[in-house]
Design a protein with these regions (language model features):
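Charged, amphipathic alpha-helical linker segments immediately N-terminal to NTP-binding catalytic cores
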Residues: 2-47
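Helical mechanochemical/support elements of P-loop NTPase systems and associated helical scaffolds
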Residues: 28, 32, 132, 136, ...
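Conserved, well-folded catalytic cores of nucleic-acid-processing
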Residues: 39-43, 129, 143-147, 168, ...
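Conserved ASCE/P-loop NTPase catalytic core
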Residues: 43-175, 179-183, 194-197, 315-332
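Conserved nucleotide-binding/hydrolysis micro-motifs of P-loop NTPases
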Residues: 77, 127-129, 162-172, 206-210, ...
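Phosphate-sensing "switch" segment of ASCE/P-loop ATPases
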Residues: 155-162, 167-272
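C-terminal helical "lid" subdomain and adjoining coupling/linker elements of P-loop NTPases
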Residues: 213-215, 241-316, 322, 326-340, ...
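Terminal-proximal interaction/regulatory segments of ATP-powered molecular machines
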Residues: 303-447
Length: 447
């Protein structure tokens, strides 16, 4: 006869969240982060701190309700792995083509679609997303903003998070110069600022390494069923106000930005501090990361939507010292509009009143080539005032160049200046003096 001496259930019938909270107290933050990453199959020993934070961000839609996340990056960085393999509560929609009935509500059968059945709906290969119904994207926008949607006579609410993952085919530098970081999206989504503004977080997939065998762990982590169950249990809790004890968000964040940042902060607190115990420094680390992830969305909206999204200088204020700290995105350069140190020859920054009446920073970058005295300007468009003030500067240099320096030539050289409006407030017409300084600087080869 067969007798069973001991039976260990592999699948969890229920999860004791208090057990997780008590267990968390035995770990440091770094150790707990490593356990969470190993539970997902990653080997943290092969990753730097930044990469760990980015990989952990992929789990945010699993712990937060109605969280909208986007990750675009190179191939073979494991973008869709978590949503397909780690949680049985998330579904990966491959192939792109879908219908409103499948995703939201089937009016014929009176059944709720994927958003009502799963905790997280992830779309693989965003470039191929296509709705058979014309109103598909409009309903998706409504759902992403409010967590509810109307079909027929009824309004339905759901809590599923939306994830969009896809491949970037060019380098980030090229994308930033030629289009936007949302370029891989289909045109009806990638140029719709109302849709993109609903994304809470943009993970820079190009910073995550391509996975090799050594990136996968052989070490211990939580069994997948246990991880998925306690992550699902954490969706019921809210930690979005965790930052209010120590910090206040800056004035440049509107309501959507604030909601996004609070959701990211709340998600990270659930993942890293499920016991609810954290220090000011730990919450600041999360807050800086959250502001960066949302600012990346806002920077691209500014490129696509112009003046409407000029407020991208995200900051937070320390409630103890009242010091305001600004947060930048790495791919856009440093956190300051005017960098520290000496500029290159021909590079000039000027502060002036823009077209909108707001004070802003403008950058001039110059180039000098052998030629016959031509003066070319880029970045001014058809603005007459700007062109007149730059012509005034060049004419002054032609008339008085020898008095400034004998080595300045306006007949044997061509000059090109590119003008940039760094804050999107409209180009200033007061460019005569900065243009003259830039021309002299490049002509003499001196900063």
């Amino acid at each position: 006869p067969i007798s069973i001496h001991k039976l260990t259930p592999i699948q969890m019938p229920h999860v004791d969240i208090e057990e997780v909270r008590e267990g968390r107290k035995a770990f440091t933050q770094e150790e707990w982060m490593d356990v969470m990453l190993r539970s997902c199959g990653y080997e943290p020993e092969q990753l730097n701190n930044r990469e760990k934070w980015l990989l952990l961000a992929r789990m945010l839609p699993l712990v937060e309700n109605n969280f909208n996340l986007c990750e675009l990056g190179p191939r073979s960085t494991g973008k869709s792995h978590i949503y397909k393999e780690i949680s049985p509560n998330s579904i990966l929609v491959s192939g792109g083509q879908t219908t409103v009935a499948n995703l939201f509500y089937n009016m014929g059968r009176k059944t709720v679609g994927l958003v009502g059945l799963w905790d997280c709906v992830a779309f693989d290969e965003v470039a191929g997303i296509k709705f058979k119904d014309k109103d598909g994207i409009q309903i998706m926008k409504d759902y992403m903003a409010s967590g509810s949607f109307a079909r027929g006579k009824e309004e339905k609410a759901a809590s599923a998070s939306m994830v969009f993952v896809g491949n970037i085919n060019q380098s980030v530098d090229v994308l930033l110069k030629t289009s936007s970081l949302f370029d891989p999206f289909p045109p009806e989504m990638g140029t719709d600022t109302a849709f993109l503004d609903r994304l809470h977080c943009y993970i820079p997939g190009w910073e995550i390494p391509k996975f090799r065998p050594e990136h996968f762990t052989n070490d211990y982590g939580f069994i997948t069923d246990y991880l998925a169950e306690f992550i699902r249990e954490l969706r019921k809790e809210q930690y979005g106000d965790a930052l209010d004890k120590y910090f206040r968000l800056g004035k440049n964040l509107n309501q959507r930005d604030t909601i996004a940042v609070r959701k990211i902060v709340g998600g990270y607190v659930k993942l890293l501090y499920p016991d609810g115990e954290f220090t000011k420094e730990q919450i600041e680390e999360i807050l800086v990361f959250a502001l960066e992830m949302r600012r990346r969305v806002k920077e691209q909206l500014k490129k696509l939507g112009g003046m409407e999204f000029y407020d991208v200088n995200f900051s937070y204020i320390d409630l103890d010292t009242f010091e305001e700290k600004f947060v930048s995105v790495p791919e856009q350069g440093g956190g300051k509009l005017i960098p520290d140190g000496i500029c290159n020859p021909g590079q000039v920054y000027t502060v002036s009143q823009g077209k909108s009446g707001m004070i802003g920073v403008f950058r001039l970058e110059s180039q000098m080539l052998p030629g016959n005295g031509k003066f070319e300007r880029t970045g001014l468009g058809s603005d007459r005032d700007c062109k007149e003030s730059t012509n005034t500067a060049f004419n002054f240099l032609k008339a008085n160049g020898n008095r400034i320096s004998g080595s300045i030539s306006t007949t044997m050289r061509d000059y090109i200046i590119n003008y940039q409006d760094l804050q999107g407030i409209g180009m200033t017409g007061k460019l005569a003096l900065p243009t003259l300084i830039a021309l002299c600087s490049i002509a003499l080869g001196r900063p």
